[in-house]
Amino acid sequence: MSTTAAATTTTPSTMSNNQGQGQTTIPGTGTGTGAAKTTNRIINNFRALLKDPNNLDEAVNYLYRTLIDDATAGIFIETHHLRKTGNLAALDGLAEESAYRICEMPNLDIFGISTAKKPMDCTCPNCDRLVAAARFAPHLEKCMGMGRISSRIASRRLATKEGTSASSSSSSTYMHSGGDRGGGGGHHAGAGGTDDEDDVDWSSDKRKKKSTQSSRNNGSKKNNGKTF
């Protein structure tokens, strides 16, 4: 410590020499001879600290606390200044918009769209059939009879159904009536049960009537000719 005190004291002769030359030596700012003396003084002080371990520990702790205080105070002052000026949000930057975020989830592309293969078949709610996705709309239109062509087809089907039901009812009534009147023809019609067979029966009856009429006409002609 005595060495430090001796090194930091300035003799009057030195001050007088500096004043005579028109220069004033300030520690750390001197030039020429004064700067060299300041450097020597710092080196001497550093060597004095290294000789005593206790002084070295104190110096290191002091330096560490000083650095921590300066760094912390600088951060606090800067944050306070940004808060007061309204520029605190500039530290984080602009927030990224959700529309431009890149998706990194599995089975999804960078835009968040699923990359899994979608089923190409659809189930019809009316007939429970599997239909291709490209043909689902026209199939549903036809299946439910919503379009123009589909409505025409549906009306035709309805008309044919009504016609077949009416023809079947008329044929059944005819078979019942024929069975009540006479045995052979009605029984034969009941055995067949179709309109075509009924038409054949009518044609056979007409043929029988024509044959009887022709035989009568032939007999009358023979009588007129008096051929006995």
UniProtKB/Swiss-Prot annotation:
Sequence segments annotated as region (Disordered): 1-34, 154-228
GO cellular component: cytoplasm; DUBm complex; nuclear pore; nucleoplasm; SAGA complex
The keyword Cytoplasm is annotated on this UniProt entry: yes
Location within or outside the cell: Nucleus, Nucleoplasm; Cytoplasm
PANTHER family linked: ATAXIN-7-LIKE PROTEIN 3
Function: Component of the transcription regulatory histone acetylation (HAT) complex SAGA, a multiprotein complex that activates transcription by remodeling chromatin and mediating histone acetylation and deubiquitination. Within the SAGA complex, participates in a subcomplex that specifically deubiquitinates histone H2B. The SAGA complex is recruited to specific gene promoters by activators, where it is required for transcription. Required for nuclear receptor-mediated transactivation. Binds independently on SAGA to promoters in an RNA-dependent manner.
UniProt domain comment: The long N-terminal helix forms part of the 'assembly lobe' of the SAGA deubiquitination module. The C-terminal SGF11-type zinc-finger domain together with the C-terminal catalytic domain of not/nonstop forms the 'catalytic lobe' of the SAGA deubiquitination module.
Name used for this protein in its record: SAGA-associated factor 11 homolog 2
Species in which this protein is naturally found: Drosophila willistoni
